[in-house]
Amino acid sequence: MSYYGAGMLRARWASWRDWRQQRRGQANARWGWIKPPAGRGPAIWMQGFADFDDLRLAADLAKAIREKRLDLRVVLTFEAEHPDLLEQMDGVPGLGYGFGPCDHPQAVARALERLTPLRYLALGAPPRRHLAAALTQRAIPAVLLGTGPGLGPLPPVEAVYPRNTEQAEAWRSLLPAARIEDPVDFSTLITVAQVEPNFRALACGGDDWQLWWVAGVSAASAGRWIQAWQGSPLRRSGLLFLSGQGVAPAGLERMSRWARTPLAPGSALWVDEGRWHPALAVAAQGVHLEAASTGDIWQAFAGGRPLSAAPLSRLSRPEAMGPELVPILTAPGAVLARWQGLLGDPMAAREQGDAARRAFWAERRRAGERLPAFLERVFAW
């Protein structure tokens, strides 16, 4: 990921590289040269940083804000580009998007001068140190969603919408209780909840293989998963799907190159396209969350399959991820042994999957009930 901190030399170096690679818009925006949409209405600055799931939510909220307040101009900035996501925002009146500034005081000041925002909204992380200080200096209220507090100074917080109880507790010593909303995860509203269950037929043909999915695999851990898989009896009648960030590990076929023909039992594939995740969540007999994003976590819950997980940060994991519903497992062999046990106890597997699905829908209902109040806050600005 490109540099967006406060260091002058590193930020200049990052911008020079962007210029060399014809990314002039990113280079200019890093130093605050951001242009709001045309118009005279007040501007709202939404900062989505680099996380794909936070940006998905930011894009949907930006469109909802525009529908609620037609006079507002909404500026959504990010630090990593996702072209498929950005296409969804093309043509929305009063909505602009692009790369954001780094945290050097000069870049922050220039961005705020050009945007003169009525409010600042951050999703997934709090504003960095110099931006938080500048918001305070200019008395620009901030609304923070899905994040705990950072290590630097606080901006003038109007409200926080924590994702879970742990985030809410982290705010209690810093803010009056009236500014801390009850925990809610709005990302459940953009989770794909209804999926046609045809992926199994595509992968297995006329055979009845079991499908297993591990989400959030790193390149370093992929080898351990393959080694454990090759020694597991599940391999005789199963297919293993590993998804994660970065380049596919050596020897693993990528889903983007899969010819959509039935797979042989024992096959292992690297899922390098996120569009397959909803189908995998529904088709798999079991899902393990190694270092998964919030989006993948809720997608797995929505799929209604037995879940397990590696230890995840308490500040970022969903409220529903208690050990009674999602056992904590670290070694690939332990996960495969759990899956083997689920094959021998289909009733328990069904009950665990149903409980996961109920947890997803309960959180989605809460988010749906809370969203109108958030939009009413926007309407009152």
Regions found by a protein language model. Give the residues of each.
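Positively charged, low-complexity intrinsically disordered leader regions
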Residues: 1-40
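A short, well-structured juxtamembrane/interface segment
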Residues: 26-39, 151, 194-203, 220-225, ...
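Active-site and donor-binding regions of nucleotide-sugar-utilizing enzymes
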Residues: 29-32, 41-190, 217-221, 232, ...
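Conserved catalytic-core segment of nucleotide-activated headgroup transferases in glycan assembly
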Residues: 53-68, 191-262
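Nucleotide-activated donor-binding/catalytic signature segment of Leloir-type glycosyltransferases, i.e.
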Residues: 89-99, 249-272
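Acidic donor-binding loop of glycosyltransferase active sites
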Residues: 115-119, 265-293
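Catalytic binding pocket for nucleotide-activated donors in carbohydrate/polymer assembly enzymes
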Residues: 157, 278-359
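C-terminal alpha-helical cap of glycosyltransferases
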Residues: 363-381
